[in-house]
């Protein structure tokens, strides 16, 4: 997959400026925005309606009250997505019972192909505590906008692939953005970030 990965090394909100700079090019090419305008919204301020791979309706307000770990991707992704979902599964296993307190979600950026059933079949390969989310393109775009993430449909050889933000988003139980886990970030750094939002 041709991808422009979001490479971040933030440990907490104090490091989030690097995240904002990594996203700013596509959100404000011709206008100036404050760094705060480029951070993910608090979950309670997001506004989208998606469907889980189990067929349940999901809105961001449902997540408030528990820490959230979220990742954007798609099931046809050859490398970044299965690798990251495998890493997330490993983190959840390492966290033990504490992992049950997390909302752990995989939000597709390819709703055209990633139906509820496709997501269900795909996620059967990973930790069952990961919830897949799909919906209309408009609702996926609303979710991506709330997270201040990005995605792009890229034509390829008569078909297409998807570019997308590759980091894992972490939010505190009150819905405030906490940090990003970078693609392929070492477990010794990733797990403490997750434990901080659980504390």
Give residue ranges: language-model regions.
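Structural microenvironment flanking redox-active thiols in thiol-disulfide oxidoreductases
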Residues: 83-143
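A short beta-strand-turn-helix
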Residues: 49-68
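Short active-site neighborhood of thiol/selenol oxidoreductases, capturing the structured segment around
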Residues: 62-82
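Short, small/polar residue-rich loop motifs at catalytic or cofactor-binding pockets
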Residues: 43-45, 67, 163-165
């Amino acid at each position: 997959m041709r991808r422009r990965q979001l490479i971040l090394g933030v440990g907490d909100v104090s490091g989030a400026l690097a995240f904002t700079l990594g996203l700013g090019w596509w959100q404000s090419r011709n206008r100036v925005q404050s760094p705060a305008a480029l951070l993910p919204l608090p979950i309670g301020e997001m506004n989208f309606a998606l469907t889980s791979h189990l067929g349940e309706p999901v809105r961001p307000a449902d997540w408030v009250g528990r820490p959230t770990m979220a990742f954007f991707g798609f099931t046809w992704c050859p490398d970044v997505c299965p690798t990251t979902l495998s890493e997330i599964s490993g983190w959840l296993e390492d966290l033990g019972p504490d992992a049950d307190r997390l909302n752990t979600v995989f939000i597709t950026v390819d709703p055209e192909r990633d139906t509820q059933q496709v997501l269900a079949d795909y996620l059967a390969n990973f930790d069952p505590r990961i919830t897949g989310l799909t919906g209309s393109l408009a609702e996926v775009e609303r979710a991506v906008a709330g997270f201040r993430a990005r995605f792009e449909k890229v034509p390829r050889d008569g078909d297409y692939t998807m570019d997308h933000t590759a980091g894992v988003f972490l939010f505190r139980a009150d819905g405030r953005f906490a940090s990003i886990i970078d693609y392929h970030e070492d477990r010794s750094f990733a797990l403490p970030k997750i434990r901080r939002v659980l504390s």
